């Protein structure tokens, strides 16, 4: 506190100041210590507007800006608009990450520091608490960016919460919507518009009637002049939706990989899909084809949004604090366990330094400072894969918890409203509302994580820019396919995933239709199948990591164990063809209750496959090409699902029943094991990083440090990161052959 004599009061506080008027009596001020830069107990004389200084070097820093009521109001107004900015700003950043919407303490601190520091006395720009995000200055504590706008800030807990929030919002659609009530509703609406196969003059009865399993009870409906079995109507609808989904994710992959569109597109598809699901409340018997159209749009939007969500996973892992603390900026092979002195501190040479000191790299170590070994590439790969699996499995588990809760709510609605199509439409409306509402936290907390800028010859906008992005995306896809052929483990994974994802999607829809049409289960009983499956999925999502550690299984070995359990489902259905099993009257899916233990197996297996496949593939992707390679992942996933439901639908049309489709399911479930068996994660990661250097023309951040090249290599990395590099932009396939 200042020692004051006279009428003028001049107080210094950490957050505000009241200045003396421009005129007034001379005031003798005795400054107390404010910063280490100023001496204590120095007398200064205040004479009106100017201060007489005996020594100009003792002049204190400029007074901070007056923090008035208007400043409070300005901050309150800015804080009240945070959520609105999250949806409308060009950056679409999380509230706590926006430089213009800092927290109260950060705003005050950066404002005061910018005005009180003599070094910044002439700088009127707003401070950024996370450091400069463009120059890669090591003083900011952040890794140097690989391209302009690269967000190298560590992954925060709020950002992870935003990623989990979207899984919590959208998984209910695939569990309760497309995996349960949408195929049930589509089959019911098609049957209400269909006629009997044996007598086309008679309308179909309810699918719960026992005679519908016979040839006389089969029901057909005419769609665009084609005769389709009502049980296969939903299967064909899904085939069309995944075909469009595959085309869509390719077209948006460029916009997701380049620029700042990844998060915007995710939210756009989320709200389009949720709106379509809520629109089922208006669907009736006469508009059943519109119901199929809503299923196509919603499923396409869901798939596209999840491709974009998956593309965040490698970025969250790469910038996670547990990965960043490896010590890339330390000496080769070793890193200190504690942070050294600040760069502004004067380095005092120690008399104990000798000829070996120069070998320690560019960092300065105090005598006796403990050293710890930096992780090798193989250890880092193992740690990143473990962290990726944990995050992925946790996201799956959170989504399953949401699906389980909403499935119980749906069953209560169905029982209360007597299992009518109206009750099914209400359930779907609730599912869509859930999807839309819980997407809001993801919009607020998830960072955009922009990619490299797209190389363009001129500044284009509007429709021309959209057309340019789409054309570039398809060109990039073919380049990505060409590049993926060089990555043995990527090829092996995608070949296995092509069949495995088809088996997952087709088994779910086939089982629901089999239970409804062959076992004559009520909608609430069908909902119980999903409740059991979802509960088992939660258990599987959190149990497979324990199982893999207990038996020391690698990621691809855990996937093989899941496939082995998965194969039991179609094999059990085929047991119904055995004469002695038919004589028992139970077993081989002859009784409705048999669906429940199989649902438990399916959910437990899916809980492991969903997390491990996604994280395993993420480790094999060349850094910087996440959205492009996840688009290829989605094409393999959803593109294969075009064939599965269509083949099952053709089997139903040809045979009049669903059980023969289990032969097809048994084949596509078991075959992927042949490809997954030969995957080597360490080899795939090394090849991916090497390919990333060819694609983007840069060395991975910290790679030279890990390999022992020291400060010189790090300086080269920093110099190489100044220029903008576009993924696949300047890559010449012919030259690399």
Curated annotation (Swiss-Prot):
Signal peptide: none
Transmembrane segments: 166-186, 232-252, 264-284, 289-309, 395-415, 426-446, 487-507, 524-544, 559-579, 593-613, 632-652, 661-681
Biased composition (Low complexity): 125-141
Any Pfam family: ATG22
Location(s) in or outside the cell: Vacuole membrane
Coiled coil, from the record: none
GO annotations of cellular component type: vacuolar membrane
Keyword vocabulary terms for this entry: Amino-acid transport, Autophagy, Glycoprotein, Membrane, Transmembrane, Transmembrane helix, Transport, Vacuole
Record region (Disordered): 115-154, 327-353
GO biological process: amino acid transmembrane export from vacuole; autophagy
Function per UniProt: Vacuolar effluxer which mediate the efflux of amino acids resulting from autophagic degradation. The release of autophagic amino acids allows the maintenance of protein synthesis and viability during nitrogen starvation.
Designated name of the protein: Autophagy-related protein 22
Protein source organism: Neurospora crassa (strain ATCC 24698 / 74-OR23-1A / CBS 708.71 / DSM 1257 / FGSC 987)
């Amino acid at each position: 506190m200042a020692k004051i004599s006279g009428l003028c009061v001049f107080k210094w506080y950490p957050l505000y100041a009241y200045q003396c008027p421009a005129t007034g009596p001379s005031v003798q001020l005795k400054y107390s210590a404010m910063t280490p830069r100023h001496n204590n107990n120095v007398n200064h004389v205040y004479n009106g507007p100017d201060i007489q200084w005996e020594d100009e070097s003792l002049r204190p820093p400029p007074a901070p800006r007056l923090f008035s009521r208007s400043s409070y109001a300005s901050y309150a107004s800015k804080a009240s608009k945070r959520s609105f900015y999250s949806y409308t700003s060009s950056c679409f950043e999380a509230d706590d990450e926006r430089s213009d919407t800092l927290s109260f303490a950060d705003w005050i601190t950066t404002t005061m520091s910018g005005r009180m520091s003599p070094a910044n006395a002439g700088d009127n720009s707003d401070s950024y608490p996370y450091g400069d995000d463009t120059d890669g200055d090591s003083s900011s504590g952040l890794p140097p960016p690989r391209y302009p706008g690269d967000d190298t800030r560590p992954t925060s807990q709020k950002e992870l919460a935003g990623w989990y929030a979207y899984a919590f919002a959208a998984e209910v659609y695939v569990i309760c919507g497309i995996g349960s009530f949408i195929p049930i509703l589509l089959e019911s609406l098609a049957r209400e518009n269909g006629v009997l196969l044996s007598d086309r003059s008679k309308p179909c009865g309810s699918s719960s009637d026992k005679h519908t399993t016979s040839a006389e009870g089969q029901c057909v409906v005419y769609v665009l002049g084609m005769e389709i079995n009502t049980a296969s109507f939903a299967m064909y609808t899904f085939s069309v939706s995944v075909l469009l989904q595959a085309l869509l994710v390719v077209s948006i992959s460029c916009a997701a990989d380049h620029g700042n569109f990844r998060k915007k597109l995710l939210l756009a598809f989320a709200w389009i899909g949720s709106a379509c699901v809520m629109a089922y409340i208006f669907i009736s018997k006469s508009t059943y084809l519109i119901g199929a159209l809503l299923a196509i749009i919603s499923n396409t939007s869901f798939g596209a949004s999840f491709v974009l969500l998956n593309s965040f996973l490698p970025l969250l892992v790469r910038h996670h604090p547990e990965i960043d603390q490896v010590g890339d900026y330390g000496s080769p092979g070793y890193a200190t366990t504690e942070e050294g002195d600040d760069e502004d501190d004067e380095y005092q040479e120690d008399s104990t330094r000798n000829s070996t000191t120069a070998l320690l790299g560019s960092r300065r170590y105090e005598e006796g400072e403990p050293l710890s070994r930096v992780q090798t590439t193989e250890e880092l790969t193992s740690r990143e894969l473990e962290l990726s699996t944990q995050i992925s499995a946790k996201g799956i588990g959170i989504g399953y918890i949401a699906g389980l809760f909403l499935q119980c709510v749906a069953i209560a609605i169905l029982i209360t409203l007597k299992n009518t199509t109206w009750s099914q439409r209400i359930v779907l409306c609730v599912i869509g509302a859930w999807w839309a509402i819980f997407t809001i936290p993801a919009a607020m907390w998830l960072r955009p994580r922009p990619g490299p800028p797209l190389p363009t010859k001129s500044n284009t906008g509007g429709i021309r820019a959209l057309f340019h992005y789409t054309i570039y995306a398809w060109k990039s896809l073919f380049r990505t396919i060409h590049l993926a052929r060089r990555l043995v483990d990527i090829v092996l994974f995608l070949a296995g995933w092509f069949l495995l994802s088809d088996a997952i999607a087709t088994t779910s829809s086939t089982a629901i239709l089999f239970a409804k049409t062959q076992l004559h289960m009520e909608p609430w009983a069908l909902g119980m199948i999903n409740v059991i499956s979802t509960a088992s999925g939660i258990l599987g999502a959190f149990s497979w990591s324990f199982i893999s550690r207990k038996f020391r299984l690698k990621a691809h070995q855990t996937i093989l164990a899941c496939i082995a359990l998965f194969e039991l489902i179609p094999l059990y259905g085929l047991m119904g063809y055995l004469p002695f099993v038919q004589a028992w009257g139970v077993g081989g899916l002859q009784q409705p209750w048999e669906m429940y233990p199989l649902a438990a197996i399916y959910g437990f297996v899916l809980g492991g496959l969903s997390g491990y496949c996604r994280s395993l593939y993420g480790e094999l992707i060349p850094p910087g090409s996440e959205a492009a390679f996840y688009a290829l992942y989605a094409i393999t996933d959803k593109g294969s699902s075009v064939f599965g439901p269509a083949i099952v639908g053709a089997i139903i049309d040809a045979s009049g029943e669903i059980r023969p489709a289990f032969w097809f399911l048994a084949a596509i479930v078991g075959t992927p094991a042949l490809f997954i068996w030969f995957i080597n994660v360490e080899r795939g990661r090394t090849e991916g990083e090497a390919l990333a250097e060819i694609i983007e023309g840069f060395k991975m951040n910290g790679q030279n440090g890990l390999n022992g090249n020291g400060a010189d290599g790090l300086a080269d990395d920093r110099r190489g990161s100044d220029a903008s590099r576009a993924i696949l932009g300047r890559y010449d396939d012919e030259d690399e052959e």
